[in-house]
């Protein structure tokens, strides 16, 4: 594992290093964050139904791998790693009324890349921060980080013309 992942093999040895999810939600939205990759694997709107009211099918913005978030990491030992393939350690806390999910990709006990998701009460907007600590000896700082974010949107209404009319 050390041979393939270098310093980030540390994250693969943690108890959270499994294909599992952490849920963070409020009254209007529910998110499932993947431990592998640290990205949003599912996003469901709790107060909106697909097709017609009473159908019971909630609008799912993200599901079935239709979204991808990845940062390409160039290491000092000439490895190219993708965050989507690495395990993050989740920590869910509350700060006041806000829920904060910290997803850390660790190269050691005190060195990491962190994705932080912040969900406020009754709010559809999600705060998202990326920060690092202690990675200057691990990452090649002469090369820029490439952020890749893709989303293939689902059709949530039966009529595509209706959906296009109210979507921008």
Locate each region found by the language model:
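Soluble non-transmembrane domains of integral membrane proteins
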Residues: 1-168
């Amino acid at each position: 594992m050390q041979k393939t992942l270098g310093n980030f093999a540390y994250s693969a040895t943690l108890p959270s290093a499994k294909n599992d999810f952490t849920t963070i939600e409020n009254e209007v939205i529910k998110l499932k964050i993947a431990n592998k990759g640290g990205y949003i694997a599912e996003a469901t709107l709790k107060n909106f139904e697909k097709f017609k009211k009473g159908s019971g099918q909630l609008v799912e913005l993200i599901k079935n791998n239709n979204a991808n978030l990845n940062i390409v990491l160039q290491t000092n030992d000439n490895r190219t790693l993708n965050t989507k393939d690495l395990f993050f350690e989740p920590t869910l806390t509350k700060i006041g009324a806000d829920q904060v999910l910290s997803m850390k990709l660790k190269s050691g006990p005190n060195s990491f890349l962190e994705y932080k998701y912040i969900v406020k009460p009754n709010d559809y907007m999600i705060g998202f921060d990326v920060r690092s600590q202690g990675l200057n000896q691990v990452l090649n700082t002469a090369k820029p980080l490439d952020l890749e974010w893709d989303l293939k949107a689902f059709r949530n209404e039966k009529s595509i013309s209706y959906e296009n009319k109210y979507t921008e």
